[in-house]
Amino acid sequence: MILGIGSDFCDARRIEKSIERFGARFTERVFTPLERAKAERRARPAETYAKRFAAKEACAKALGTGIARGVFWRDMGVVNLPSGQPTLELTGGAAARLKEMVPEGYEPRIALSLTDEGPLSAAYVIISAELIGTPR
């Protein structure tokens, strides 16, 4: 069953301006250490950060909270499965909110799709619940 859907767009030029203006204060407030390490290895870190920023916004919308009510930026981190598929790892307030959303006897699933074209990035998040033991 679908519990929440969120989407967001982000312009890497906006992220780049925030990094120029605030530097590490911005990146450390918004992104997990893993996300920062990945972005800083890239030729165009702002584009990598923009995809992750869009994913966090989309996830916060799917959670039904936005970046509020105890859900903070670093509570949502984009990680890759061994297959390379992106997903979200939730901690803190985001994990607590996810737990509230999932009915007893079910387990959460988070689907994340990321795309970009030039400086523009988009993310789509679907939070669903499946009966415990349902094959993936």
From Swiss-Prot:
Its EC number is 2.7.8.7. Disulfide bonds: none annotated. Transmembrane segments: none annotated. GO terms for molecular function: holo-[acyl-carrier-protein] synthase activity; magnesium ion binding. It is found in: Cytoplasm. It is an enzyme of class 2 (transferase). Mg(2+) binds at D8, E57. It catalyses: apo-[ACP] + CoA = holo-[ACP] + adenosine 3',5'-bisphosphate + H(+). Its cofactor is Mg(2+). One of its GO terms (cellular component) is cytoplasm. Keywords: Cytoplasm, Fatty acid biosynthesis, Fatty acid metabolism, Lipid biosynthesis, Lipid metabolism, Magnesium, Metal-binding, Transferase. Its main location: cytoplasm. SUPFAM superfamilies: 4'-phosphopantetheinyl transferase. One of its GO terms (biological process) is fatty acid biosynthetic process. It holds the Pfam family ACPS. Transfers the 4'-phosphopantetheine moiety from coenzyme A to a Ser of acyl-carrier-protein. Belongs to the P-Pant transferase superfamily. AcpS family. HAMAP family: AcpS. This is Holo-[acyl-carrier-protein] synthase. The gene is acpS.
